[in-house]
Amino acid sequence: MVNHTMSTPTTSSNTQKLIIVGNGMVGHHFAEQLVESGALAEFEVTMFGEERHRAYDRVHLSEYFSGRDAESLALCNADYYHTHGIQLRSGEAVTAIDREQQLVVTEQGHYAYDQLVLATGSFPFVPPIPGNDSEGCLVYRTLDDLDAIQAAAKNATNGVVVGGGLLGLEAANALRGLNLDTAVVLYLLRAKRALT
C-alpha cells in the first residue's frame, strides 16, 4: 500500500485541510457552496468519491436507459473541481477514519485533515431473504448498477423490483423500457412499519 500520510494536518497558517467524504449530490452541493461563498480560499479541499464517476443527478437516473450518459447526468463539467482547486479522488473509497490522528484511510493511503465533512449518502436496502446475493439480484442506485441491470436484461424476459418507493418505481419503469415483463413487490416488514 502506498502511504500518503501527511505529517501534520494544517498546510499553512492561512489554510486548513478539508476532506469531504462523498462525491454524491450532497457532497457536490457542499463543494459548490464553498465555491459560491468564497470560503474555498480558507481550505485545501480533497473530495473522495467511491464511484468512478463524478457527482451525477440520481433523480433522473432512469434516463440513462433512454440514452443519457454519465456526462449528461453529471452535476458539473469535467473541469469544475480542478478549476476551483478541489482535488477529486474518484473511485477511492474511504475505509476508515482515525479521529484521534485526524486521518482518512483508503486503500491508496492515509490523508490528514483539519476539518472533515461526511456526505456519504445512502445505500440501498436489500431485504434479508434467500437469494438476495444471487447473480441476477441487483440494486438500483448507481450508474454501475444500471450497467449491470442493462447487461442482465439482455438475457432475461422478466424482472421483479422489490420496493415501491420512488427509486423502486423508477427501476420498474426502466425494466419495462428494457422490454422485460415487470412486477413490483412491496417488502412486507417495511410496509408494516409504514402503516403503524
What kind of feature is each model-predicted range?
Residues G27, G168-L169:
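N-terminal Rossmann-fold NAD(P) dinucleotide-binding loop
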Residues V139-T142, G168, T196:
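Short, conserved glycine- and acidic-residue-centered signature motifs
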Residues S7-Q87, A174-L195:
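Beta1-alpha1 glycine-rich phosphate/pyrophosphate-binding loop at the start
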Residues I97-D98, E170, A191:
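Short secondary-structure capping/turn micro-motifs that flank functional sites
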Residues H53, P124-F125, D145, L167, ...:
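Surface-exposed, flexible loop/turn segments at secondary-structure boundaries
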Residues V2-I19, C76-V162, A183:
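FAD-binding core/adjacent interface of flavoenzyme oxidoreductases
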